[in-house]
Regions:
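Active-site beta->alpha N-cap acidic-glycine motif
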Residues: 1-59, 66, 81, 88, ...
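Metal-dependent polysaccharide deacetylase catalytic core of the NodB/CE4 family, i.e.
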Residues: 27-113, 117, 121, 128-146, ...
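Catalytic-core region of carbohydrate-active enzymes that cleave or remodel glycosidic bonds
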Residues: 118-125, 185-192
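A conserved mid-domain beta-alpha-beta active-site/ligand-binding segment of alpha/beta enzyme cores
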Residues: 143-186, 192
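Short, glycine/charged-rich beta-strand-loop motifs at protein surfaces that mediate ligand recognition
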Residues: 173-176, 205-209
C-alpha cells in the first residue's frame, strides 16, 4: 500500500465542523481542527460543548481569539490574540492544545516568535503545493485547499509563496487540469509516487455554501482506500513523525527546527 502520509486541516471552528468529523470517523481518517473563540467576521463558531465533543475525535488547535489577521493589528494585540486564544480554548476543552493556525495565512516573523513564546508546539500556514512538512514546524505548509479555485489563483499563489523549486513539480502535475476537483485527485496520485505528505485543508462553511459534501465524502473515501491506517495522521502526529523519521517527510540536507 501507499507510503504517503495524509492529513486534513479544517479551519475557523464553524459548527458544521462536526459534520466533517462524522465523515472522517466513517472513513477512519484523522484531522486537525483550528478554532477561534469568536469570529470577528461574523461567522458562527461552535460552542464550548461542541468543541469538547469534537475534541473527543480529533486534534483541536487554536486560530486566535477572534480569528484575527495578525498582520493587521499591532504587536500588543497580536500577542493578546495568540496567547488569550490559547488560554480560553484550553479552558473550554479542559486540556492543553499544541497546534496553531495563522488566520488567513497572514503572519510575519515576529508572529512566529509569539506563537512559540505562547507555548505552542507547531503552527500551520495556508502555503500550498508542498509534498512535505516545510522548513520548520512553525510554518507547516499544505498541499491544496478543497475549494474550486480557478487556475489563475493557483498560479498567483505559486508566485507569491516562493520556494519555487520545492513546489514546481506539484504545480506541473495539476496545472493543465481544468476541473478543480480532478486537480486534487491528480495531485494525490502525483504525491503518492513522488511526495511524502498530502495535506488537504478546508472550511466547513465553504463546503456548505457550495454544497460539496458529497464530493468531500467521496474524496475522503478514496483516500481511505489508498492510505493505510498508520499513515493517516493529524498535524500533531505529522510533527511527531517528522521528528522521528526525518527522511520520510523532510529533505536530508535541511535543518529540522
Amino acid at each position: 500500500m501507499s507510503s504517503l502520509v495524509f492529513t486534513l486541516s479544517v479551519d475557523d471552528g464553524h459548527p458544521l465542523d462536526l459534520r466533517i468529523a462524522e465523515i472522517l470517523a466513517r472513513h477512519r481518517l484523522r484531522a486537525s481542527f483550528y478554532l477561534p473563540i469568536r469570529n470577528a467576521e461574523g461567522a458562527p463558531v461552535m460552542t464550548a460543548a461542541q468543541a469538547r465533543e469534537l475534541s473527543r475525535y480529533a486534534e483541536i488547535g487554536s486560530h486566535t481569539l477572534d480569528h484575527c489577521f495578525l498582520t493587521r493589528v499591532d504587536d500588543n494585540e497580536a500577542w493578546r490574540q495568540i496567547s488569550e486564544g490559547k488560554t480560553e480554548l484550553e479552558q473550554r476543552l479542559g486540556h492543553a492544545v499544541s497546534g496553531f493556525c495563522y488566520p488567513g495565512g497572514q503572519f510575519h516573523a515576529r508572529h512566529v516568535h509569539m506563537v512559540r513564546r505562547a507555548g505552542f508546539g507547531y503552527a500551520r500556514t495556508i502555503n500550498n503545493l508542498y509534498s512535505d512538512t516545510g522548513e520548520q514546524r512553525f510554518t507547516l505548509p499544505t498541499s491544496l485547499q478543497f475549494y474550486p479555485h480557478k487556475r489563475d489563483v493557483l498560479i498567483r499563489n505559486f508566485i507569491s509563496q516562493g520556494a519555487y523549486k520545492r513546489r514546481w513539480s506539484a504545480l506541473q502535475a495539476i496545472i493543465a487540469e481544468d476541473n478543480w476537483l480532478m486537480r486534487i485527485y491528480r495531485l494525490f496520485d502525483h504525491l503518492e509516487q513522488h511526495g511524502q505528505v498530502f495535506h488537504l485543508w478546508c472550511h466547513a462553511l465553504d463546503i456548505e455554501r457550495l454544497q460539496l459534501w458529497k464530493e468531500l465524502d467521496y474524496f475522503l473515501g478514496f483516500v481511505a482506500r489508498r492510505i493505510p491506517p498508520g499513515r493517516r495522521l493529524d498535524n500533531s502526529g505529522l510533527i511527531r513523525d517528522r521528528r522521528r523519521d526525518v527522511a520520510l517527510v523532510f529533505p536530508d540536507h535541511q535543518k529540522v527546527v
